[in-house]
Structure formats: C-alpha cells, structure tokens
Amino acid sequence: MSKTEIPSIRFRGFDDAWEQRKLGDVVKEITRNDPESEAPIMMITANNGFIEQSERYAFNNAGESLKKYILLKKGELAYNHGASKLRPYGSCFALTTAENARIPFVYHCFSAENQNAEFMSIELNGADIENQLRKIVSSGARMDGLLNISFDEYTSVSVLLPGTEEQDRIADFFRHLDNLITLHQRELEKLQSIKKALLEKMFV
C-alpha cells in the first residue's frame, strides 16, 4: 500500500504527487562477492561517501576478511551502519566514482531498479529517514562500533518517490552543489596554506 504527498518546494514543471513506499519494496539486496576481483577496495565516510581505503589507511586492514567483501557495481548503493558525529544513524551512498568496488561485507548493499540511485542516497541521508531509524535503533544497540540494525529493519523505512525525471533533476542539482562545495573547499585550503606560509615568513 502506498500514499502520495506533495513536497513544499520543487522544480518548476513538476506537479505530480510523490509516492510513499516502503524502501524494501523498491530495492533488492546485494550479497555478491568475488575473491579474485581486482576492483579497488573502498569504504564509506559520512563526509565524502565512497573513498578508496588507501586514502584513510596506509595499509590494507581487511586481511582475510577481504575474501568476503561485497563486489558493488556502479549505480548500486551501500548503507554503512557505523555511527558518526555527522551521521549518528549511519550513511548511505551510491557508487558513482568507479565501475566496481570491493566494500566491507558488514555494509547493507542494494540496487534500486527504476530509481535514480543518487536521488535515493540523498533521501536516505535525510532527516526524515534519520527520525525513522532513531525509532528502530536503540542508542545503546552497538556491536563493534556498528548500529545493530539488520537489512530488513533498515529497508522497513518509508521513502517518498517522485517520477524518474524529477529524481534525475534533483540528483543533478545536488551533484552540482557538491561539486561547488568541493571546489570552494579546495580554494579555502589553498588560501589557508598561502596565509600560513606568509605568516611564517613575515614573523621569523
């Protein structure tokens, strides 16, 4: 059963109501692995989404568990149910920067056919989903730093889905915003480095 809702703000030209669905009704779990794969080893961070593990660690810390790593394909999604200050109820991202990636088997991975994966990740990182997860996961329910939430529990949340054209438009907009943020962050870091160098040379 589904309900429909209309968002308070949206792009001009879209008038249809958004459909409320259970996440589990529109996604399919992914558990595939390939011990022989040479795909990059990646992980999810709350700030930046998918990054290569080598960007965070100087060595491969997967060890023997690497054989169990899930092989994710471009356009598929993963939910990292590790709590962080930025995202206390975990974070979900679509793989967009590589054709394939090997990712920790503790992540909940899934495909969302007929949906825009980037749009899905935007919604699944939103405040409404966090509120729903708060009711599912006790703040004390932790195991090895992970929120104790199963795939079925995670996909029991409700999502609001517009048509695919509107999903594409929203995903494009937020991708552009993210690119602008990254660009300005790099410019800021560059200016901070210049300032530091000038201060060091002026006051010697």
Regions found by a protein language model. Give the residues of each.
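Short amphipathic coiled-coil heptad-repeat segments
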Residues: 1-16, 186-204
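A short beta-sheet element
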Residues: 67-129, 142
